[in-house]
Amino acid sequence: MTRIAITGGRVLTMDPERRVLEPGTVVVEDQFIAQVGSPTTSTSAAPKSSTPPGWQCSPASSTPTPTSHKSSSGVVHPMTATSSNGCTTCSIPASLPTQTTTSESEHCCTAPKPFVLASPLSSTTRTSDPTTSPAPGPPGSPFTDAGIRAIYARMYFDAPRAELEELVATIHAKAPGAVRMDESASTDHVLADLDQLITRHDRTADGRIRVWPAPAIPFMVSEKGMKAAQEIAASRTDGWTMHVSEDPIEARVHSMNAPEYLHHLGCLDDRLLAAHCVHIDSRDIRLFRQHDVKISTQPVSNSYLAAGIAPVPEMLAHGVTVGIGTDDANCNDSVNLISDMKVLALIHRAAHRDASIITPEKIIEMATIDGARCIGMADQIGSLEAGKRADIITLDLRHAQTTPAHDLAATIVFQAYGNEVNDVLVNGSVVMRDRVLSFLPTPQEEKALYDDASERSAAMLARAGLTGTRTWQTLGS
């Protein structure tokens, strides 16, 4: 049996009582949390002889915390970061096929690696990754190597819309030398591929890797495609995800809002994780609550693409479970959940002119226990409680930006940068110790990864006719 005792710091438990133990101790035995409590009551479960050296934290300097769960993100397009600057929501799906068709298999293998590297460095240990096509080899293999959790959400379009052809043609004209790739596929083809992915890869790597169906957008997926995803979630995968109401065009296509359309089809349920949900009204929110649909809000992505601001305070007021996602690098340029937590808090304060509209405590809940609820794992992760999986981060608050740290929740949300994350455990295994990742133990290996990703990105964008550069664009005279 492997035992680890993390002692000496404040423990943010996120348990039902939201206890903050100061000082506190978390005892880990193999994959599970054995005890959470004061040093005197907990350390007896882990004798010093079994405790790895160095896990004694300086008083008030390190905060053991449940790991963050990014409820929706994307990993295929870190290779295209900043290339979408100035694009709107609708132009992103139209332009990405041009980029993706230039991706060699090696690029698809390299692209997730910077994402995987950045995730634990800024607190994230579980992510949902919607992607339109299977990566070469085992989906999630970079996640397997890194030791973090991942949901490989197989995104698909099986009902392309003629209404978008003019828009796609206009955008494609900007890169006439690029070969356009049609990402749509027949429903039967998609479902056969999804069946194969689930059979081969779901619940692999000690259960850390999951495969979900992910019909892309209601107005570009057939009724058959959506109902099949719902049935697969109920019988095999426990969850499914979809982009919902990110852009107002979804309402125009169906002459009703997307949530109402999904309700009409019987496709709202408690296994659905709906991403974005920007252009929705009070009826839509009531439907989400009625069916216990989970929401992944993407504040930075929605701001980056000028999509709008999701009515998160209204969702919370109605009792809807909301988690936080970063979205992809092509519409965020970062995968730093801690910095996105601050953006989420500030945009709603500004939009409502109400400094108490979302509290830092609620933001922390959305990033931890509510994020776990979004992916159906609140009984296993999301809080530091005996019997749960040992998914834990420690934050070193001895930095200029986090000094002083009077209020723990406010410090994490409003002061932290993300580089305060010092240690990461997933399933009881050490993924990062003193900011050294277990899968990249030397600076040379880390630098080689950055160099490889940069070179492949430049080559990919060049073949797509997207140089990644543009003239300096100022405003005014």
From Swiss-Prot:
Domain of life the protein comes from: Bacteria
Keyword tRNA processing: no
Enzyme Commission no: 3.8.1.-
Chain intervals for the UniProt region annotation (Disordered): 38-77, 120-143
Keyword annotations of the record: Hydrolase
Pathways involved: Xenobiotic degradation; melamine degradation
Low complexity: compositionally biased ranges: 38-73, 120-132
GO molecular function per UniProt: hydrolase activity, acting on carbon-nitrogen (but not peptide) bonds
Similarity-based family: Belongs to the metallo-dependent hydrolases superfamily. ATZ/TRZ family.
Free-text function comment from the UniProt entry: Hydrolytic deamination of the S-triazine substrate melamine.
Name of this protein: S-triazine hydrolase
UniProt source species: Gordonia rubripertincta (Rhodococcus corallinus)
Name of the coding gene: trzA
